[in-house]
Each structure stands twice: as C-alpha cells, then as structure tokens.
Amino acid sequence: MNGETPDASHPQQSRAELTLAALGVVYGDIGTSPLYAVKETFNPAHGIPLVTENILGGISAILWALMVVVSLKYVILIMRANNRGEGGIMALLALALSSVKKVGRSPTPILLVGLFGAALFYGDAVLTPAMSVLSALEGIEVGTTALQPYVLPASVGVLIALFLFQRHGTAAIGALFGPVTIVWFLALAAAGIHGIARYPAILGALSPLHALGFVTQHGFASFAVLGAVLLAFTGAEALYADMGHFGSAPIRLAWFGLVFPALALNYLGQGALIIVNAKAIENPFYLLYPSWALYPMVALATAATVIASQATISGAYSLTKQGIQLGYLPRMNVVHTSERAIGQIYIPTLNGMLLVAVLVAVLGFGSSSNLASAYGVAVTGTMLVTTLLTFFVIHYGWRYNLLLSLVATGFFIAVDMAFVSSSLLKVAEGGWFPLVVGAGIFVVMLTWVRGRQALLERLQSTDVPLKSFLDSLFLAPPPRVPGTAVFLTPTPDVVPHALMHNLNHNRVLHERVVFLTVKMKDVPSVPATECAAVEPLGHACYRITLRFGFMNRPDVAQALGALPPAAGLEFDIMDTSFFLSREAIVAAAGGPSGMASWRERLFATMSRNAGNAADYFNIPANRVIEIGTQIKI
C-alpha cells in the first residue's frame, strides 16, 4: 500500500531516544492491562470452569487478540493511513473526508461516523484513569484486607492530584515516563517467566488452536468472555494517535522489541499461576509476585497507571484542540505548557470536566471489576470507526479497487464487530456510562457544526460583495485616520460586518485596511511558504488569507509579522487595530437552522461561552475592538 509516509523529522533525537519516549506515552495504557485483563477474562460470572483447557484457551485468546488487533491491524495497516505523518481519529477523519470529496461523494455519512468515534474516545478518557488507578491500588488488598477501606479514598486522592497537576505541564516529569515504563515492562516479563517456570505447558497457549477451540466449545459464554479479553488491548489506539510525536519506526520498534514480548510473558505467567492455584484468580497479577515484592509492585503499578492516565488525558487535550481547529467544537482556552514542545497543552475547561466525570466513575462503580463492564464499549467503538475510516482512505484516497480495499480491512472490521457486540452485552452492567458520555459529546459536536452552518447562512443572507462595495466607497471616500485596521472575516469576498458598523458609527477609515481570513486546513501543518496569501485591492486595502493545519497554533500576530518583504506589508502590531465581530445568538422557534429548539438553545449557550477569538488567535487584547451583533437562528 502506498499510504506510508516517512517518520516525522526529529533531528535532535535519535531513534533510541524516541523509542524510550514512546514507551512512556504510547504504551502506558496497554501496558497496565495485565492488572485486570486475566482476572476479568476468568471472572466466575461467565460460568466457565477454571480447568486447564479453558485457561489455555482464554490466555490464547488474549495473546491472539493482541496479535491481530495491535500487531496486524494497527502496526501494519492503520499506521500507514496517516495524514502527512499525523495519526489519531480526527486526523484520519480529515483524511477520509478529503479523499471522499475528491471523487464527488457525499462526506456526511463519514463525518457522522467519524465524529461518533471521536466522541467515544472521551468515554475512554474518563474510564482509563479510573480503571487504571483503582486496579493498581487494589493490590494492597492482597497483602491485608485491613487496608481495603482505604483503596477508594486513595484512588480519589491520586486522581485529584493528577488533574490538579495538569496546569503545570508534563515537561518536568515527562523525562521519567520512559525509564519508569521500561522498569514496569521488565517487571512484567520477569514475573511472567517465573510463572511459566511453574507450569511450562502454558506455552501451548501460543497456538491459536486453543483460542479457536475455546470459542467453539463454549459458544455464547465464550462470546461474553470476549468482552473481557478486549481489556488486554485497551490503549492500542495510542499507537496510531501518537505517530506525529514519535514517528512510526520507534513505535513499532518498542512494540515488537519490548512491549509485546513482556505482555505475552506476563499473560502466560498469570495463566500458569491459575492452573497451579485456582484461588489465585482473585488477583492473579499481584499473586504472581513473591510476598516481599507486593508493596513495591503496588507503588510501581500506581506510577505506571498515573503515566497511562496522563497519556490519555494528553490525548484528550490533543483531540479537543484538533476538533476546535477543524470546526467541530467551540473555541476553548488552550494553554501551551512548554515553549519548546508545541504538543504539550492544557485545556482548563476540559480538565475540570474530565476530573468530575472520572470521580463520578470511581465513586459510582467503586471497583475495577465493576468498571471493567463499562470499559470495553468506548474502546471497541472507537477502534471500529478507525477501521471503517481506513477503508475509505484506501478505496477513495489511495484509489484501490473495492475488492482490494475490502480484503485489506474486511477481516479487521469483522473482528472489531465481534468485540463491539461482546461489549454491548454489558451495557446494562455499566456499558451505558461511556455510551452516555459519547452520545453527549456527539450531540454537542453535531449541534456546533450545524449551528455554525446556520449562522454562516444567516450572515450570508445580508452579505455585500467586497469588490463592488470598495468601488462605491471610494467614489466619495471617508476621512482616513493613521494606522492599520485588520478586519477578521470568515468569508473573504464579502464586506465584514465589523467594517459596516465602524463606517456607520465612526464614519472614518484607517489609512491601511486589511481584510483577514483565517482558514484551518484538513492537514496537520501548513508549510511556511503556503501559510499566507496577500492580494492588493487598491486604495491601500489588502486581502490576506492565513492558513493553518489542525496541529498548528493559529498565531495571527506572529504570522502577520512574518509576512515576506515581497508582500509589500510590514506590520507594527502596536500600530494595528483588530476589529472582530462577536455574534450574540438568539434561539428563535421555527428559525432557519432546522434544529430542535433545545439544540438551538444549546448552540446559543456554547456560542456565548466559547473562548475569546482574540485569545485563540493570539492577538494582543489591547489592540482588539470587538463589535457585537445579535443574530436569530
């Protein structure tokens, strides 16, 4: 396939350094799955006896799920479908939409599917910290039941501290993530080898025949077990989502060189332990270690789960930023916590909402076993959407025929469907929680997209063509005042409403006038040579278009200051006034938006509380003049 692109350029870092960094960020979530995956796979509620053949089959199912879903689907297929080196469901959605538009197909169904997959990720972002931290701290119950009442308060304390720390950024402690994660995977491998030595026949689980026999022998019961097996590959989406940070080669090297072998050894070791001692099913992960290592492992597991949670939280920030810049979410205040790494961001509004949702999940479900029922729905749903979007990229973007596109993705779609179906069996037991979170975010995104369309249509109904307006204006030109006026407008060919209001009320025009349009492209970044386009309109008026990718920081002040001399414009920001329109949305029953009245009110609320455009575009507040307009939709 021809979708592979070279790794992102990291001239200051070697492949070894990138691989070490990827271990801490990419593999934190999937690396902590041994804490609960085996325990939940053999949960007595499934009604499958703990006999040797069943244990071999269950462990084999876990190993081959990792092989098929992670090694084959993500590492070999999905990571090729990158958007100029950038991964993640928003980047893939943008790529799929552009691929479909090129051949004249309607993008609406793909947009709906992609946004739903992105919405489900937020359910995962809520459950991952809750599940991971709870399962780590539950290890202290293995040592003594006297500490059991403190597990929940300790988990709440760790999570609150984690979210409160977000505003400081991860630059200071991020360097520790890789080394700590290496120690974690080595500890997984060592314990696994120790367990295998107690029952070497567990190596028979490496054969897929045991997994197939397990599924065929137990029928519907084994189908329900798949809902627990999928816990072994939660976090696989991170391999794709973090491609832009590390490149595909370091991520693949870390997976095949350390992560997959360590996970396989640990799962085999836990299986051997259960065969030797069936009572170990209470907590096979911690019971795999000698008693003297229990509390050090609880501490190490807590550190590993905090790292996993941090990676998920950072992923939610990144997804939200991309969603804002692609126009799927309202503007929020995005704080850059590092001067050197543009990807290290903090979104206060999202952080607060995530913290509340995570605490609700922890206190509401109370244990990792209860959370396990809720965990799988969001993960498998997002994975299915990723595979579907990849099909559209292969077929429409890479121009492979339908048969080859189905051959490449059909098997993985079937596997994803099986896991989605098995996780839906647990909707009543807790699977409803991420579905409610995802549905809520989905409605918010759809409402914002439709509301912005309705607003633009409403504004266009009163638009005046810019060219003809300027021609008539300068037949009897208004007085000119010193300085530069920049009018931000989403439509470069029409007169900005802020200019009309300025002329009506002040009856003057600056000596230099710029009509500025900022366009967000469906690519990760826009080369500096293509960022700005300047068009003289006469009478010292100019039309400027700035282009940014969804991974760029839309810094208008910097972009204007960096205009090449050939453009004929030099900007002194302190001698420039920026005129912005701010629409006050009024929800009107039976308005032109076509939305239900409650959605119109929701859009009006989101619009009213959206982040300030001046802050978002990094325009100095003391150079901004904001003009309000009331609009009914």
Curated annotation (Swiss-Prot):
It is a multi-pass membrane protein. Coiled coil: none annotated. Its main location: membrane. The chain crosses the membrane at residues 59-79, 110-130, 145-165, 173-193, 219-239, 256-276, 287-307, 345-365, 374-394, 402-422, 429-449. It is found in: Cell inner membrane. GO terms for molecular function: potassium ion transmembrane transporter activity; symporter activity. One of its GO terms (cellular component) is plasma membrane. It comes from the Bacteria. The keyword Magnesium does not apply. InterPro entries: K+_transporter (IPR003855), K_trans_C (IPR053952), K_trans_N (IPR053951), Kup (IPR023051). It catalyses: K(+)(in) + H(+)(in) = K(+)(out) + H(+)(out). Keywords: Cell inner membrane, Cell membrane, Ion transport, Membrane, Potassium, Potassium transport, Symport, Transmembrane, Transmembrane helix, Transport. Transport of potassium into the cell. Likely operates as a K(+):H(+) symporter. Belongs to the HAK/KUP transporter (TC 2.A.72) family. This is Probable potassium transport system protein Kup 2. It comes from Cupriavidus necator (strain ATCC 17699 / DSM 428 / KCTC 22496 / NCIMB 10442 / H16 / Stanier 337). The lineage of its organism: Bacteria, Pseudomonadati, Pseudomonadota, Betaproteobacteria, Burkholderiales. The gene is kup2.
